[in-house]
Amino acid sequence: MKPLHIVMENFGPFIKETIDFEQVETDQLFLISGKTGSGKTMIFDAIVYALYGMASTKTRKEGDLRSHFADGKSPMSVIYQFKVNNQTFKIHREAPFIKEGNITKTQAKLNIYELVDNQFELRESKVNQGNQFIVQLLGVNAEQFRQLFILPQGEFKKFLQSNSKDKQSILRTLFNSERFDEIRHLLLENVKQEKVQIENRYTQIENLWNDIDTFNNDELALYKELESSQTDKMIKKFPQFNDYGCKILKSFEEAKNKITKELDDLNHKYKVNVELSENTKKLKAEKIKFDDLKKEQNYIDKLKQELKMIQESKVLITYFTRLQSLKKDKDELVSLHEQSKLNETNYHNEIKGFQKQLEHLSTRENEITQFNQYLEKNQVFFNQLDKIISSYQQKPVIEEEIKRLYSEYNDLITKKEELTKEMNNKNKDFAIIEHYTEEIYKLKKIIDESERQKKDEKLFDKLQLDKSSYLSKLKEKKEQLNEIESSITNIDATLIDLNDKKDFVNEIKSAMSIGDTCPICGNEIHSLGEHIDFESIAQKNNKIKRLESKKVKIRDEIIKIETRIEELNHRENELNCEKQEKKDISKLQKQLNHLNQLKDEQQSINKLVENFEKQEKEIVNKIHQFDLDLSRKNTQKEKLEIQINDFERHSQFSSVNDFETYYSHAKKQVETYEYENEKTKDKLNELNNKLKIEMNDQKHLTENLTQTSKEINNLELKMEKEMQQLGFESYDQVKSAADLSAQKDEIEREINIYNKNYQSYEIEINRLKELVKGKKLLNLEKLRQSIEKTNLKLDETNSQIATISYKIDNNSNKFNKIKNIIQILDDELKVQKEIFLLSEILAGKNDYKLTLENYVLIYYLEKIIFQANQRLSFMSGNRYQLIRREAISLGLSGLEIDVFDFHSNKSRHISSLSGGETFQASLALALGLSEVVQQESGGITLDSMFIDEGFGTLDQETLETAIDTLINLKSSGRMVGIISHVSELKQRIPLILEVTSNQYESHTQFRKN
């Protein structure tokens, strides 16, 4: 990630400040300089706040970032533009605050944009989703970003000197190693659950084994004392329990069969005697009922005689019933005939009355015809009364509108003539303006070129002076280098390789004697005295090292000076200051002002003419519009006059109200007449139809009455003849016979019931006599008591059988459950054995006494130390390297850092380093950590890094080494920014971001050295 721009509003000491990081070249090192409290670190806070909504350090809260000098209505906001993976993004984050006059905070705001086709497109507009988007985009969270992007004051010294526990919390955050500890906890929890599960299974086996029934057998009871872990013995004893249970069950089933046979015999005897007792009682009851039935014989004989009489007089009764019906019909016909005669008379009278009413209506026929003609002629006007009324009302309004339009029309004509006079002798000229513009551009270009040339000449002179100074320094350094090389050449290098070989030579001397052959040169040894001055050799060797070190340093300085001279030559070539004719800038400026004045005057004339033309065009448009309006209004007036004249000519009224009253009256007269005439005609037709129907009914009634009288006479003759044959003397006797005939069905039913019951009793009594014949009745109570005793005995036996069967089945089920649990238990123990071992190893019960998480963190720490040592070796002149302390303890060991000193060839505690050495180690560790986190965070590349303070503890030489390290960083493509008060840095670093403060507000500005 590389910063491009940042805009801070009401953020710390910055009320409204913009920093353009694009002024920093791709691989340039720059310094952030300013007084204490001016807001240097706040720049980092703004970047981290824009990305993650928090400050660059944990100690600062969001509320601490808002400027104390911000007004009460403006929010604190940061707009941050940056580039990552060749994509450009812009973030606008606004902090919540309590606006002046309110009591609740405003909502936080976050908008994230991406640059697509030179336009920013919105990607996220919600705070939570936006925060997740940033983490996914950068691949690091806020804590990791703090460690990668900013090296804050004292943070890495603290990390360097911290113990394993403190380092664990930091590394855990950076490398998300909690997941490894979660794995350990999950595995441990799984092991605990599995152990509980195994214990539960043994408990289940024990409970099931204790529930096994022994059938009160002492031998089986002894088997139940086996422990739940003795599963093999349990399985071997299962068949003995089942065999003994089946043996007991068989003995009880044999006893049951014997009792069942005895019970069946008793039940059969009891059933036979119960049936005999019931049949005896039933025979006695049937005989009593049969005797009672015989007592009704006389009543039945009387009913039979009445039935015979009804059957013999059947024809006579039919004649009598028909005669009574005909007489009733005759009386009804006589009554209807008299009523019809009365109705005929009433209809004749009503018809005469309606005929007179119709004659009266015909006298108004001519009057109604005239009304109808008027209504037809003026119906269209009556239907458009509102329109006619509106025409009367609109006519004077339109006449007044026409008068007003003529007046305004004349005014516009006058105004147009006045404008035409004013526009005389005034013309637009855009060509001359273009000419003036072109001349002005040329003059400005000449002036700018002259001023630039003047500045370049001054800069060129300064570069010449700087170049001359650096050439002198270069000459001086080369002379020093030649002197050092000459000194090294003059030192006698003979025997220099024997340095540090004194002990080896003494060992050889102690093993040799005079006269022996030398193992190195092969010559005879004549003397064992001191032939080599080891102290002199060591002094020469140290002197060569010092000269070589000084030589390397001078060469580095020569390279830096040559680089600076090359840079100055490059800048001279860019300036290319050739001697040119100098222009009079003041004279050129006067010409420019004169041309601007002429251009402004012509532009004013053009604007005035355009204004006149615009007004004239508006007036012409208005005149044309007035012509259209007048034509439209006159047309409307003509239409209204035609409509009013037509109305008055046809209606013969000049008043709409009078016409409406007369038209309504005429319409009502016509409607009333038509209604009365139609109503009268309909009534006459109705009465004539009723009269015809009534006369036709009278004819039919007369015919029916004659026919009925004739039929009555014939029936009376037939009845007299039938009465003589049957011996009936009067109609009353016939009526009594007819009444008795109505009871015929009931009489027949009673006779049939009697005969049926009589026959049924005879058959049942004979059947029962056969059933009880020759049989002796036993004592039923004694039989019942014997059956109850036998049933109780059978129930007890069945209960014993059911209990034993249940116990056998229950034992079998429990045996199967125990077998299944044992099988599951065996399978689980095979699988979980390795998991139990793995859980103990991950929990720290291993040779290294390390948990899984600490083992992973040690791996990351060693990678960090490896990266850090590459820089620390350079900064310390190959003297120091960081090493991990490999002490063994439980859980949190292995994260302490020691330093290895190659001068003493020993490791020592990190706190033994001086302040400058501690800074070197901290810086190297910070850079190493940054690189490792980038490697582990999905390949995210941070193209920038900021270092906050720490250089004040360094001496001049160490400071130079630290700066060289940072220069190597920026040469790898990173933009590196440093916050420091050290004055040497201001001289060494070519680009400075100055932060200035006026007690309440700060400002920033890039400045080049």
Curated annotation (Swiss-Prot):
Checking Gene3D superfamilies in the record gives:
P-loop containing nucleotide triphosphate hydrolases
Query: One MF term in GO for this entry?
Result: endonuclease activity
UniProt-annotated binding residues for ATP: G34, K35, T36, G37, S38, G39, K40, T41
Q: Which GO terms describe its biological process?
A: DNA recombination; DNA replication; double-strand break repair
Q: Name one Pfam family in it.
A: SbcC_Walker_B
**Which residue ranges does UniProt annotate as crossing the membrane?**
none
- Coiled-coil positions are 397-499
Q: Which keywords does UniProt give here?
A: ATP-binding, Coiled coil, DNA recombination, DNA replication, Endonuclease, Exonuclease, Hydrolase, Nuclease, Nucleotide-binding
Q: Which InterPro entries match?
A: P-loop_NTPase, Rad50/SbcC_AAA, SbcCD_Nuclease_C
Quaternary organization:
Heterodimer of SbcC and SbcD.
Q: Which family does it belong to?
A: Belongs to the SMC family. SbcC subfamily.
UniProt function note: SbcCD cleaves DNA hairpin structures. These structures can inhibit DNA replication and are intermediates in certain DNA recombination reactions. The complex acts as a 3'->5' double strand exonuclease that can open hairpins. It also has a 5' single-strand endonuclease activity.
What name is this protein filed under? Nuclease SbcCD subunit C
Annotated source species = Staphylococcus epidermidis (strain ATCC 12228 / FDA PCI 1200)
Q: Which gene encodes it?
A: sbcC
